[in-house]
A protein has these predicted regions:
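Canonical Rossmann dinucleotide-binding motif of NAD(H)/NADP(H)-dependent dehydrogenases/reductases
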Residues: 2-41
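Active-site loop of short-chain dehydrogenase/reductase
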Residues: 7, 97-98, 144-149
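N-terminal Rossmann-fold cofactor-binding loop
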Residues: 45-49
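Rossmann-fold cofactor-recognition segment
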Residues: 61-78
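Conserved NAD(P)H cofactor-binding loop of Rossmann-fold oxidoreductase domains
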Residues: 104-110
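Substrate-binding pocket helix/loop in short-chain dehydrogenase/reductase
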Residues: 112-114, 118-123
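A short, exposed helix-loop element centered on a Lys and neighboring polar residues
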Residues: 137-138
Length: 149
């Protein structure tokens, strides 16, 4: 442990999802675990508060790091710049800097073929993935530039 000690990492879609066999199946949670093992403090975003709180509880217990869970939903009906600015402002207030940004979040209409997608289902995928990455990169850039992240 130690490569990312005292570094701050924002991971979108970092909540803890439990599979039917009891294991954790979220890619974001796997990424969070890898950074936690190296001593990074984490800002985890997602739509589901319970998954974020579960991730915070477990990662802090196992790795003695700090985790800031922030509910954030980038969608067609949201003021997405304000949502992302709020996340980044909370990260800076809590940790003072941002060293790494992982744009992991991506929602989709599971089990629906592309041909059967509605416009709303397609918007969900585009906003949660493409637009979220754009807004997070834009808002985090000055802090990442400062820390050479």
């Amino acid at each position: 442990m130690g490569f990312f000690k005292d570094k701050t990492v924002i991971i979108t879609g970092g909540g803890r999802a439990v599979l039917s066999d009891g294991s954790c199946g979220s890619i974001g949670y796997g990424i969070a675990t890898a950074y936690a093992k190296e001593g990074a403090n984490l800002v985890l975003t997602g739509r589901n508060v319970k998954k974020l709180e579960d991730a915070k509880e477990e990662l802090e217990r196992l790795y003695s790091i700090k985790v800031l869970p922030v509910q954030a939903d980038i969608s067609a009906s949201a003021d997405n710049e304000a949502v992302v600015k709020s996340v980044v402002d909370k990260a800076i207030k809590e940790f003072g800097h941002i060293d790494v940004l992982i744009n992991n979040a991506q929602a989709s209409a599971s089990g629906v073929t592309l041909a059967d997608h509605t416009k709303d289902q397609f918007d969900l995928a585009v906003y949660s993935g493409l637009y979220a990455a754009f807004y997070y990169m834009k808002e985090c850039y000055p802090y990442l530039k400062e820390t050479k992240g």
